């Protein structure tokens, strides 16, 4: 007899979503997921907290078609004012505040990406890798290439603020 994954494995815990967060109509947020104030989950993204919790910090945006998933003993913790670019995958990892994960990047179990970091588009941050605060990292496997200067860090902050504004516009439209 075939087992039903959704009824046997997925938790009965419901997501905790801030009233100021935006979740697109066709995004999936399921299980032990917490979305902070002014956070956003854009179109087609999937956040599935079935084996461990997912915590998305205030002001963080999870863009179109991202996948955020966990593994046993590997929760996902994403800090505040983080931008997770289109199609990125976060799996059982930690991402610090004010960081940008580029489009199509993959961050694997146990990886730790610091605050004020830029992970380049298409990068692969391997299992248990550590990217220090203030780093530019890219490639497959991702390697730290340089430290970010204050201007680059300010751009990371602005990206998060821009997406907070866009999310609030989408939320208002969706609630009409």
Where in the sequence are the language-model features?
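N-terminal segments that cap or nucleate solenoid repeat domains
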Residues: 4-41
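Glycine-rich hexapeptide-repeat left-handed beta-helix
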Residues: 2-16, 50, 56-58, 64-66, ...
